[in-house]
């Protein structure tokens, strides 16, 4: 199956594309995109998956199809220095664009992202940015990976347990096994369970409470994950992330 994803990731994840769970996943995603009129004409969610084109879409699914693999496309396999694991894409209008915790420019910061920026300000003294778009982090080597890559509008968790988790597990596993000295940032119990197999002797694993307002004061604030990440990267001959 010829999946439209960044070439280095395509090579490393090729076995996944032929597995039964992934075929079932593509069938499910196709069923979630019934017919309507959406710009741009002729664009496909996954061209080679033979899924429905955008001009026939009626269901509202986030992120837009061209951004489903955005985390991989912006951060090639050999360029990954940091992995941050999220859970679901944002499910509100205009928010999700394929990077966990990130929102498009001009969109108000969701509460978790506000708390992330507060911790960066406290940890590094950096000002809170005007945009919540974290593409810059991805371009500097941060894989901002949600466990589930699509979601129905206003229905958190609606695409869980359909196959995305197995696919993103495979991506994390191949990184952990074939690369060294990556920083894995695991906020909250969900991310920590997903990253439980990572070899702590090969990589730095930073775990804390989630930045959600429900848990941020229980260990997220003050975790200094951003400075600790950069210290580790520099100690291993890599350039730091410009958080």
Predicted regions, residues:
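A polyanion-binding, active-site-adjacent surface
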Residues: 3-11, 15-186, 190-193, 198, ...
């Amino acid at each position: 199956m010829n999946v439209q994803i960044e070439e280095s990731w395509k090579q490393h994840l090729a076995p996944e594309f032929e597995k039964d769970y992934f075929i079932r996943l593509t069938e499910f995603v196709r069923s979630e995109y019934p017919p309507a009129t959406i710009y741009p004409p002729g664009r496909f969610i996954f061209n080679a998956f033979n899924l429905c084109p955008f001009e026939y879409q009626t269901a509202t699914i986030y992120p837009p199809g061209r951004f489903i693999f955005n985390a991989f496309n912006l951060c090639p396999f050999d360029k990954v220095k940091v992995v941050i694991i999220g859970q679901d894409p944002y499910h509100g209008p205009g928010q999700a664009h394929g990077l966990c915790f990130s929102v498009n420019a001009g969109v108000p910061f969701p509460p978790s992202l506000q708390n992330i920026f507060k911790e960066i300000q406290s940890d590094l003294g950096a000002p809170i940015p005007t945009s919540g778009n974290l593409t810059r982090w991805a371009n500097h080597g941060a894989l901002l990976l949600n466990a589930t890559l699509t979601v129905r509008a206003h229905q958190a968790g609606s695409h869980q347990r359909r196959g995305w988790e197995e696919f993103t597990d495979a991506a994390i596993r191949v990184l952990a096994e074939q690369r060294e000295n990556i920083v894995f940032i695991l906020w909250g119990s969900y991310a920590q369970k997903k990253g439980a197999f990572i070899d702590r002797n090969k990589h730095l694993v930073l775990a804390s409470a989630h930045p959600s307002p429900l848990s941020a004061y229980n260990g997220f604030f003050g975790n200094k994950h951003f400075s600790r990440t950069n210290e580790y990267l520099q100690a291993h001959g890599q350039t730091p992330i410009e958080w």
